[in-house]
Amino acid sequence: MAHRIIAQNRGKGGPTYRAPSHRYKAALRHAGKNDALVSGNVIDIEHDPARHAPIALARLDSGEKIYVLATEGLGVGDTVSWGTGGTVKNGNTLPLGEIPVGAYVCNIEARPNDGGKFVRSSGVQALVIGKADDGRVGIRMPSGKNKWFNGACMATVGIVAGGGRGEKPFVKAGKKHFHVRSSSERWPRVKGVCMNVIDHPFGGGGHQHCGRPKTVARGTSPGRKVGHVAARRTGKWKK
């Protein structure tokens, strides 16, 4: 009798596929709200297993310590601020309505005071491209799409640190192994046609093709539901 395929194992949610959130340092949020001004000093730059971008440990004027997303050029000893009335400089967080057109921003809030949702990956940035009469601010996202935000949403001035991370090749399989192991990702990924017949519906047969139609119905039982699920059409488009 065949055992469960990888897709079924993944759906169970065991420790092999579960994100190691117990190793994450903190949920990164803006230190202040958009109706006040909070400032502090950067006391350390650290690595967080939850992300590829480095994070900064800041001590606020109140004595509280908080982790925030680091931007390029931010260093230990720098003074940063969050909230309305701050200076437009690298690392400071202000409402979008106070940031001039043409500035690079990151860690943008989707709604006012939600802590930051967009543009948080290493090396990415968005661009302030315009402001509307109703208070909205136009942002060009890293994808190239233009998106409008509430002018009260806060964003950090600058580019997320850690750019160019993907340019260095792994070279050796061992380095790739430890890289994916840190995020509980299954690696390497083996094609179904390369597996034994017990491991996948496309496996076995001593050949490198599935040997059956790849289209399966929406209501197909688990373990057989692989390939083109409920496909309207298959194959290449004719020019």
Swiss-Prot record:
GO BP term, example: cytoplasmic translation
Region (Disordered): 205-224
Record GO cellular component, one term: cytosolic large ribosomal subunit
Domain of life: Archaea
Family annotation (Gene3D superfamilies): 2.30.30.30, Nucleic acid-binding proteins, Ribosomal protein L2, domain 3
UniProt GO molecular function: rRNA binding; structural constituent of ribosome
UniProt-listed Pfam families: Ribosomal_L2, Ribosomal_L2_C
InterPro entries linked to this entry: NA-bd_OB-fold, Rib_uL2_dom2, Ribosomal_uL2, Ribosomal_uL2_arc_euk, Ribosomal_uL2_C, Ribosomal_uL2_dom3, Ribosomal_uL2_RNA-bd_dom, Translation_prot_SH3-like_sf
Keywords: Ribonucleoprotein, Ribosomal protein, RNA-binding, rRNA-binding
Family stated for the protein in its record: Belongs to the universal ribosomal protein uL2 family.
Role noted for this protein: One of the primary rRNA binding proteins. Required for association of the 30S and 50S subunits to form the 70S ribosome, for tRNA binding and peptide bond formation. It has been suggested to have peptidyltransferase activity; this is somewhat controversial. Makes several contacts with the 16S rRNA in the 70S ribosome.
Subunit: Part of the 50S ribosomal subunit. Forms a bridge to the 30S subunit in the 70S ribosome.
UniProt-recorded name of the protein: Large ribosomal subunit protein uL2
Organism for this UniProt entry: Methanoculleus marisnigri (strain ATCC 35101 / DSM 1498 / JR1)
